[in-house]
Every structure is written in structure tokens, then in C-alpha cells.
């Protein structure tokens, strides 16, 4: 009890003692190769950056490295979040996430920064963190290593408090913990630590504002995910029963199953070496080429098998070993950067898999958003599907009949009909499951713009339409759903007004033709006045339309001016960052001198104001009918359940993995583990078993499905096994 009370106080006192100045972390972008060539565009801005080391232990011994990107248009205390991104491994640097996935930069073949149109910094500040100690540029002076996830969480909390003390403006922002792969273990543990910290705070202002976890291709439940390798590979045609190596794969799978069912006292429940070997046998069936474990429809040279994928990895290493770059990032250059360090190992003898933390986190009100590329093998969609199918939260198991299904498409421009299939979405009881069509293990690497739509869903910046009997979510490059709906509504109203005007003109013309000639001449002055008034009304409406168009044009002009004025020459293409680093090189724009006629200005302003007041009521009703909040409630957002499966109607040939099959043997299974999560050998393989496996070990009832005994034919010519401890979960 004393420990629980004193620890937060010690953490806070530690942060006060350091007293870091954020100016010391400011990054001079001019020192980064290619930076001066970057220009602002409508959908991308040159970021303001901070980087360096902050303590992750109270004795200041362990130093975590971070690199933070801000959108220069972001104002203080606005509603945009702080996103902390974590790569996996353990031991894989989040700088890969910064330069190959969701950061504002990508690298060309010269290791120069170029813009990433799908950067998440356009939706909030993004911080990339190297952790645990020993990962990337993070280090410990005394070589203090951690071995448990709880210890890693403690270090993260110390870093986070130091960060907030250094960047107090971010304290009130919503914190989003996001990451991929083994971050599926980190993020739930870190979130649990944050919730515990918040419970100990008496002052509401001292609490950390966390509401959601984003986990991509997550490693959540090793038992079920290990057992998905063979059935998933069969389903996708990666392996076939006729393959010479198939029997050997089955034998290794049985070894994995037996290991999972054994007593793990004194051993980790997060890593099973015999199960890692299953994947090694699947991807390397000969010594010439093998399957890319991170994107199974691509092949790689043996024995790499995806370890050198993606190709940007070599450019990233070149960039992060450049002395000028390291100096600009305030990074420790005592050892060379590598993407994944094999010496960073977590024993996790005490730790439980993070899947066991998730039910309580969901029930506490934290949202969980899982997103998966459907071409990933190492953390595949079938494995995640099996994990969720057995997950119990809020009194139910898995998704129920209340789940709603949505298709998801992406458009560069909402006004265009050109769109790409992005994936599908499933949502119920605080948990969202998203699949990205044709996505890899590193979803944002090959689907950057589409993956940013995940953030847009969370913040209700997607369009919901009903077509072909299905609900469909539409995300876009700019995510400006409000602007799109307002423009769409204005166009509809303008068309209605034009139709009314034409009708009035026709009626007036008919009235004039019915009058007598004398009456026309007698009433000519009055008719002239009426016609003049009508013309004035038409001109006023035209002025309103023109003003709306001018507003749009002005926005485009301002973007263009921002680009031109921000980059007057090739000598200063970074928006003035070298002139004023602390202010982040604000982009100043010249005042528009047109419209200096105040009389005309106020006339137009009055007309626009009147138009806005009238249109506001219509727009409000229109938005309510077409725009639906997604994912979270509270703070003005209502809940909308949503659902879609990315591996619909799983077909594993003769290998049935249905839950309700009564013929699966479950003897020796631990607690909730059942063999139906894997597969069974069916009747048509019975002949293959004869002469290889004793009949006493097999069930041969007609129509039955059985565990049987996995069999193997010795094969001295089989390919050398790949050690899967070398294949990291980035």
C-alpha cells in the first residue's frame, strides 16, 4: 500500500528535479538530407521536430530516445491528440515507424527525406519512442536490462512523466498509444499502468487523458496465434498437403501443441521456441527462395525470408548512421543503429500475455482498435480472429449478433467517384476490428493513406453511406467531412434557389403578356421598379454564390501563397526554420489587398451572414442524416457499432476449424485451449496414415474428424530450419 502511494510521488519529484528545457530538443531540419527541398502542400506540411533522450528510470541511468513531429498549423491546447508510436520485437526501433510507416518522411535511394502523404502528423503530434532499453538509440549507462513487461511499463511511466514535464502543452491532449506487432504486448501493459496512475491522483488535472489503444497486426495471445500458422497457410495456399515438407510441418506443429499443453512453471508464456520452428518450416521449403513472412504473396531469397524487407530498411540505416543526422537529432552515437537488436530480450517468466489484460481495460472504458493487413503471415488475420472468438468481455464472448458490418473504401477526393477498396470494419462493446485489403505486417508502409483512415474513423472524419444494401465508410486524404458536407448542402440549396428564380421569372412574364397595352404603358414605371428589384435579388444571390466560390478560391490561393512565401529560394526551403527554430518557422502570408472597398466588403459580409444563418438549420439536419460518429462516445460523440470480417467464410479444405465440431480431442489442453482452433486430419487422409501411424492411435469412424497422431517421414534432404528467434515481430 505504501509502495502504491509513494511511487507516483517519487516519479513526479524525479521529473521536477531534471527540469529539461524543450528548446534543447529542437531539431534543425536543415541538417537532414533532402529537408530543404520539402514544400508545404494542401495535404502535407513541413513538421516541427523535437528529438533526444529523456530518463526512463528515477536514477537517470536509463535513457529513452524519442523523435516527435508536430504539425506547424497545430495550435496550443487544441483537440488534436498526442500519438506515441511503438514498434515491436521486442528490440525493434520505432525509428522504422517514423521513416517507413506513419511519420511525415520517407527516404529515397539517396537516403534523403521526402514527404509521406499518409503521415499521421497531419492529424496530431506523433512521437516515436525507442524502448525497451537497448532498442534503437535508447541505452543504459550501467547496462541495466529489464526482463519483465511490468518493468518495461514502469520505465515507460517514468519517461512519460519526464516528457510531460518537458512538454507541458501536451499534458491536456488526448494520449493515443499506437503500435504494431509485439507492441500488442507493450500497449495493454502501458495502458494498465496509466490507469493505475490516474486512480492514485486526487487532482483531475494530474491525470493522463487516455481513451484508446491502436494495435496493428498485434501479437496478443501467443498460444492461439502460434496455432494459426498451419491452417492459415493451408487456407491461403502457402502450403499444400501434397508438398514433400508437409508431413514434417505437421510433426513440428504437434510438437508445438504439446509444448503449449505442458507445464510452463519457470518458463515464459509469451514465447514458445517449438512453435516458432513451425513458421520456419512453412516459409522455407527449399534453399533457393522462401516466403516473405511479413507479406506472404512475395518471395525472398533464402535465408532472409523477409528479414531485409522492406527495401527502405537499408536507406533508413544509412540515414540514421549519418553523423550530421545524429547530431541534429541529439542522438547518442556510441553504437550503430540497427532496426532490431537480437540482444534485447524479455524473459517474461512472471508476465501473462497481454490478452489477459484486455477485458478489464475494455470494461474500464478504454477503446481497443485492432487493425490487420490481410497479407501478413507472422501475425495473421486467422490468428486474431481466433483470439477474439474466445475473448470474454462485458459479459459476452467474442462478437455477438449485435455487431454491425461496414465496408470501407478510400478516395483521394470525396467529391470524386474514384475509390479504392480499403478493407472492412467490425465493432462492438468498445472493440474495433479492422482489416486492410492487401496490407502487409507493416500496414502503413504499403497503405499509408488508407491506414490514416483508422484515425479518421476514431475522430468521426469518415462519411457513412448506404449503397447496394450495405453500409460503407468512406475515408479521404484530407479527412474534411465537415467541409464536404457543407459544400454539398450549399450546392443543393443553390440549385433549389435557381429553380425558384426561374419559376418566378416565368410567372412574371406570363402576367405581363396578359395585360393591355395601355395598362403596360401606364404601369411602366412600377414594372421597371419591380424588374429592378428582381434583378437586385438575383444579383444578391449571385454575390452569395460568388462569395462562396471566392472563399474556396481564397483557400486554394492561401495554400499556394503559403508555399511560395514559405520557400522564396532553394536556400530557404524549410519555412524559415533556420531563422526561428523555436517558433517553428511560422508561415506568414501577405494580406489580401483585393476588396479594399469597405462598402462592398460590408455588403457582401451582410449577405453572407444572412445566408449562413438560414443555411445553418438545414445543414444541421443534413449532417445528422448523413454523418455518423464512429467508435467512441462521450465528449459529444455517440456510439456506432460497426463490423466487417476480412477473412469471411474461412475455408481450410479438409482441415476443419469449426468451434462446434465434437470430434476434436482436447485432452491435455490447458484451460480454454482447444484443438479445434488448429485443424484436424479428416477421413480422406486415412489411407496416408496406414502403415505410418499405428491404428490404435487413430480414430476411423465414418465421417469422423480426429486429432489423430501427426506423422512424419524422415527427410534428410529437407531444407535447413530457419531459427525464428531471428525473425522479429517488428
UniProtKB/Swiss-Prot annotation:
Gene3D superfamilies: alpha/beta hydrolase. It comes from the Eukaryota. It catalyses: Preferential release of a C-terminal arginine or lysine residue. It is found in: Golgi apparatus, trans-Golgi network membrane. It is an enzyme of class 3 (hydrolase). One of its GO terms (molecular function) is serine-type carboxypeptidase activity. Residues 20-599 are lumenal. Its EC number is 3.4.16.6. SUPFAM superfamilies: alpha/beta-Hydrolases. Residues 699-709 have a biased composition (Basic residues). GO terms for cellular component: membrane; trans-Golgi network. The active site is at 181, 376, 441. Keywords: Apoptosis, Carboxypeptidase, Glycoprotein, Golgi apparatus, Hydrolase, Membrane, Protease, Signal, Transmembrane, Transmembrane helix. Residues 621-730 are cytoplasmic. Glycans are attached at residues 60, 497, 507. It is a single-pass type I membrane protein. Residues 486-497, 515-526 have a biased composition (Basic and acidic residues). Residues 475-590, 684-730 are annotated as: Disordered. Belongs to the peptidase S10 family. Protease with a carboxypeptidase B-like function involved in the C-terminal processing of the lysine and arginine residues from protein precursors. Promotes cell fusion and is involved in the programmed cell death. This is Pheromone-processing carboxypeptidase KEX1. The lineage of its organism: Eukaryota, Fungi, Dikarya, Ascomycota, Saccharomycotina. The gene is KEX1.
Amino acid at each position: 500500500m505504501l509502495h502504491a502511494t509513494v511511487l507516483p510521488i517519487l516519479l513526479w519529484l524525479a521529473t521536477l528535479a531534471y527540469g529539461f528545457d524543450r528548446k534543447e530538443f529542437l531539431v534543425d531540419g536543415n541538417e537532414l538530407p533532402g529537408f530543404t527541398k520539402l514544400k508545404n502542400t494542401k495535404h502535407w506540411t513541413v513538421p516541427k521536430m523535437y528529438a533526444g533522450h529523456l530518463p526512463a528510470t528515477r536514477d537517470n541511468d536509463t535513457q529513452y530516445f524519442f523523435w516527435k513531429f508536430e504539425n506547424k498549423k497545430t495550435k496550443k491546447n487544441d483537440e488534436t491528440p498526442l500519438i506515441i508510436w511503438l514498434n515491436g520485437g521486442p528490440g525493434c526501433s520505432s525509428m522504422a515507424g517514423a521513416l517507413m510507416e506513419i511519420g511525415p518522411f520517407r527516404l529515397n535511394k539517396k537516403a534523403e527525406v521526402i514527404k509521406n502523404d499518409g503521415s499521421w502528423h497531419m492529424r496530431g503530434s506523433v512521437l516515436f519512442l525507442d524502448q525497451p532499453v537497448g532498442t534503437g538509440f535508447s541505452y543504459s549507462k550501467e547496462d541495466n536490462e529489464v526482463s519483465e513487461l511490468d518493468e518495461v511499463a514502469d520505465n515507460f511511466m517514468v519517461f512519460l512523466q519526464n516528457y510531460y514535464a518537458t512538454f507541458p502543452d501536451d499534458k491536456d491532449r488526448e494520449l493515443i498509444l499506437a503500435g504494431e506487432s509485439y507492441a500488442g504486448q507493450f500497449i495493454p501493459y502501458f495502458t494498465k499502468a496509466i490507469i493505475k496512475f490516474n486512480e492514485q491522483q486526487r487532482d483531475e488535472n494530474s491525470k493522463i487523458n487516455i481513451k484508446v489503444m491502436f494495435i496493428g497486426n498485434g501479437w496478443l495471445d501467443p498460444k492461439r496465434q502460434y496455432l494459426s500458422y498451419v491452417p492459415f497457410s493451408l487456407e491461403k495456399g502457402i502450403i499444400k498437403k501434397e508438398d514433400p515438407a508437409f508431413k514434417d510441418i505437421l510433426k513440428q506443429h504437434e510438437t508445438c501443441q504439446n509444448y503449449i499443453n505442458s507445464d510452463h512453471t519457470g518458463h515464459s508464456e509469451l514465447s514458445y521456441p517449438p512453435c516458432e520452428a513451425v513458421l520456419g518450416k512453412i516459409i522455407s521449403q527449399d534453399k533457393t527462395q522462401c516466403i516473405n513472412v511479413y507479406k506472404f504473396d512475395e518471395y525472398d531469397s533464402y535465408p532472409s525470408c523477409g528479414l531485409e524487407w522492406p527495401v527502405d530498411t537499408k536507406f533508413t540505416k544509412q540515414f540514421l548512421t549519418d553523423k550530421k543526422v545524429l547530431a541534429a537529432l541529439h542522438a547518442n552515437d556510441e553504437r550503430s543503429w540497427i532496426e532490431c537488436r537480437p540482444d534485447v530480450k524479455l524473459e517474461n517468466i512472471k508476465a501473462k500475455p497481454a490478452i489477459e489484460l484486455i477485458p478489464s481495460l475494455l470494461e474500464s472504458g478504454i477503446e481497443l482498435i485492432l487493425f490487420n493487413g490481410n497479407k501478413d503471415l507472422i501475425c495473421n488475420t486467422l490468428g486474431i480472429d481466433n483470439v477474439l472468438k474466445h475473448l470474454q468481455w462485458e459479459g459476452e464472448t467474442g462478437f455477438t449478433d449485435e455487431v454491425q458490418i461496414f465496408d470501407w473504401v478510400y478516395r483521394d477526393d470525396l467529391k470524386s467517384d474514384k475509390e479504392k477498396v480499403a478493407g472492412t470494419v467490425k465493432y462492438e462493446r468498445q472493440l474495433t476490428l479492422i482489416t486492410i485489403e492487401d496490407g502487409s505486417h507493416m500496414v502503413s508502409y504499403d497503405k499509408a493513406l488508407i491506414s490514416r483512415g483508422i484515425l479518421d474513423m476514431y475522430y468521426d472524419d469518415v462519411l457513412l453511406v448506404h449503397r447496394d444494401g450495405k453500409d460503407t465508410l468512406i475515408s479521404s486524404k484530407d479527412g474534411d467531412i465537415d467541409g464536404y458536407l457543407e459544400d454539398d448542402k450549399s450546392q443543393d440549396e443553390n440549385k433549389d434557389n435557381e429553380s425558384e428564380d426561374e419559376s418566378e421569372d416565368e410567372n412574371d412574364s406570363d402576367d405581363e403578356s396578359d395585360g393591355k397595352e395601355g395598362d403596360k404603358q401606364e404601369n411602366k414605371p412600377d414594372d421597371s421598379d419591380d424588374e429592378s428589384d428582381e434583378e437586385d435579388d438575383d444579383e444578391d444571390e449571385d454575390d452569395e454564390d460568388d462569395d462562396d466560390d471566392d472563399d474556396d478560391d481564397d483557400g486554394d490561393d492561401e495554400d499556394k501563397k503559403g508555399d511560395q512565401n514559405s520557400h522564396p529560394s532553394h536556400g530557404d526551403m524549410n519555412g524559415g526554420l533556420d531563422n526561428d527554430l523555436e517558433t517553428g518557422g511560422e508561415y506568414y502570408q501577405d494580406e489580401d489587398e483585393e476588396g479594399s472597398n469597405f462598402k462592398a466588403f460590408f455588403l457582401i459580409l451582410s449577405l453572407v451572414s444572412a445566408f449562413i444563418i438560414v443555411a445553418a438549420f438545414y445543414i444541421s439536419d443534413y449532417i445528422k442524416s448523413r454523418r455518423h460518429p464512429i467508435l467512441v462516445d462521450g465528449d459529444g460523440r455517440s456510439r456506432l457499432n460497426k463490423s466487417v470480417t476480412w477473412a469471411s467464410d474461412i475455408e481450410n479444405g479438409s482441415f476443419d476449424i469449426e468451434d462446434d465440431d465434437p470430434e476434436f480431442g482436447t485432452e491435455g489442453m490447458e484451460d480454454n485451449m482447444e484443438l479445434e482452433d488448429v485443424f484436424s486430419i479428416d477421413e480422406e487422409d486415412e489411407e496416408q496414415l496406414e502403415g505410418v501411424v499405428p491404428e490404435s492411435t487413430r480414430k476411423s469412424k465414418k465421417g469422423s474428424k480426429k486429432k489423430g497422431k501427426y506423422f512424419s517421414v524422415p527427410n534428410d534432404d529437407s531444407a535447413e530450419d530457419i531459427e525464428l528467434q531471428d525473425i522479429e515481430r517488428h
